[in-house]
């Protein structure tokens, strides 16, 4: 979706395999949630 702010998680390490785990880590960082993104499967948090 256009217009959504995403930033790379600071606490998530390794390949992002599940959106649920990524979202949990992002919420722990104070973001709204997150998901795995891109070819390199990085955890991106929604701000």
Swiss-Prot record:
Presence of keyword Disulfide bond: yes
- Record-annotated disulphide pairs: 5-47, 16-36, 22-43, 26-45
Matching entries from PROSITE patterns are given as: GAMMA_THIONIN (PS00940)
Q: Name one GO biological process term.
A: defense response to fungus
Q: Which UniProt keywords apply?
A: Antibiotic, Antimicrobial, Disulfide bond, Fungicide, Plant defense
CDD domains per the UniProt record, alphabetical: Knot1 (cd00107)
Check the record and name the Gene3D superfamilies matching this protein: Knottin, scorpion toxin-like (3.30.30.10)
Q: Does this UniProt record's set of keywords contain Flavoprotein?
A: no
State the superkingdom.
Answer: Eukaryota
Among Pfam families, the record links this protein to:
Gamma-thionin
Q: What family is reported?
A: Belongs to the DEFL family.
- Stated role: Fabatins have antibacterial activity against Gram-positive and Gram-negative bacteria. High activity against P.aeruginosa. No activity against S.cerevisiae and C.albicans.
User: Could you tell me what this protein is called?
Assistant: Defensin-like protein 1
What is this organism's lineage? Eukaryota, Viridiplantae, Streptophyta, Embryophyta, Tracheophyta
């Amino acid at each position: 979706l256009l217009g959504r702010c995403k930033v790379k998680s600071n606490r998530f390490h390794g390949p992002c395999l599940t959106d649920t785990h990524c979202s949990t880590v992002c919420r722990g960082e104070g973001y709204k949630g997150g998901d795995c993104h891109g070819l390199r499967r990085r955890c991106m948090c929604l701000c």
